[in-house]
């Protein structure tokens, strides 16, 4: 028996209600799927911080410094190393570093981390690796396809990531770096790693440069490179291979290693030959 309510067939009412629910559910699922797809696309887009064109990469770090190039001379308690600066590629980070060096900020700061022969971290006024204030710690990260984490590269450390609500949901954000810096030595390039690097790199020249010169490929396009060591590589190697005490995120040297000073100048072949700064 059919029940008639207000002159309408209740069976038909139930069928229409079910159909409506199915349509609503389908619409919700469609919107959800679209949101997931868009979210994945946005994540991919936002995580691709820089577009690399293998045809136009210039591996400038493999070139010797030229007369008049800006340089930094880092005098440590273990010796001195020198690197050429790249203001044309990382203008804001180089300006921040240069300003701090010229002000004497780096005088008697600490090498506060030494990572198993791979790299060292320097430039902290405190033994625990912290900075005294944030006034020079919010420089937007600058990436460039011509700068890579080869052995001897100097990179400024990432300090923070700022994200909007949308970026927290879908990925992306703005990375910042500051005063402290890494000086890279190298990871080990065994045969398997060399093969993997050659197969995964879009640029044959870049892969071969890492294999020949060393470096830390997994840091590629992850932090701002400001310079490339051209003198004192033995000091770079020592700084990366210190005996350490593990304490939280840092491996502190067992014995204090000090950055006595960082001097900004210009490259002169004559000065290099005579040992002048």
Features from the language model and the residues they span:
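Cyclophilin-like peptidyl-prolyl cis-trans isomerases
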Residues: 3-277
């Amino acid at each position: 028996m059919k029940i008639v309510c207000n002159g309408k067939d209740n069976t038909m009412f139930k069928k229409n209600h079910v159909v409506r629910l199915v349509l609503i559910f389908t619409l919700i699922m469609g919107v959800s799927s679209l949101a997931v797809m868009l979210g994945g696309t946005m994540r991919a887009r936002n995580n691709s911080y820089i577009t690399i064109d293998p045809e136009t990469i210039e591996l400038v770090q493999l070139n010797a410094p030229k007369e008049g190039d800006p340089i930094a001379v880092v005098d440590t308690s273990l010796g001195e190393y020198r690197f050429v600066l790249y203001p044309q590629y990382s203008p804001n980070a180089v300006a921040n570093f240069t300003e701090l060096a010229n002000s004497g900020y780096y005088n008697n700061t600490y090498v506060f981390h030494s990572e198993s022969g791979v790299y060292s971290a320097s430039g902290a006024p405190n033994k625990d690796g912290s900075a005294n204030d944030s006034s020079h710690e919010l420089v937007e990260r600058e990436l460039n396809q011509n700068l890579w984490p080869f052995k001897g590269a100097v990179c400024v450390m990432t300090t923070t990531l700022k994200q909007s609500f949308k970026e927290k949901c879908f990925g992306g954000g703005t990375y910042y770096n500051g005063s402290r810096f890494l000086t890279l030595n190298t990871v080990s390039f065994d045969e398997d790693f060399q093969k993997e690097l050659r197969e995964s790199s879009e640029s044959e020249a870049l892969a071969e440069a890492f294999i020949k010169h060393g470096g830390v490929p997994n840091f590629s396009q992850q932090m701002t490179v400001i310079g490339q060591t051209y003198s004192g590589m033995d000091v770079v190697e020592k700084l990366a291979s210190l005996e350490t005490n593990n304490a939280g995120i840092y491996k502190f040297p067992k014995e204090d290693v000090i950055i006595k000073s960082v001097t900004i100048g210009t490259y002169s072949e004559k000065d290099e030959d005579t040992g002048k700064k």
